[in-house]
Amino acid sequence: DFNIGLKGSITLGEGRNWSVSKNSGFAYTGRVELFPLGRFKSLGDITEGDFEREERVKILLAGAYSFNDNTNRLQGQKGDIMPNNETRDINSYFVDFILKYNGFAFYTDFMGRKCSDPLFTGDNETSIYNGNGLNIQTSYLFPKNWEIALRNSTMFPEEKVQQMVG
């Protein structure tokens, strides 16, 4: 039942609906997905609850990394344009864990973003978020399709940008 999923992409580093500029870079992204007990039913790895009521325990452990070269957006492929037409390299990483069984679902996502120079000279209100985040969610789907869920999301900004992002 063990299964592996591999995904990769090379895209424009500025996201959708972007025209080429002299500073444009690319974003290089890769993802590895491990399904040690087999794949989920009906793409259950992309829905939050266990709507398929998995009859056997199913687990996903995944990791992804993205390098956005010379982007001019504050969030890489999204967000506002950086001040003064500046560009930065942004590294992002993600680790996901999903477990589902008979209506019970547990998700956790750990993610982070790193930029070597997240602040802008002469602009005390704009920064690139440097730090980590953690999402945890657990839920139970009752047989009549009523669901209860508990979720917590927390951000851990690096000290350099903490005063700007709260």
Model segments located where?
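Solvent-exposed loop/turn segments at secondary-structure junctions
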Residues: 12-15, 112
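Internal alpha/beta core interface subdomains
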Residues: 2-9, 16-43
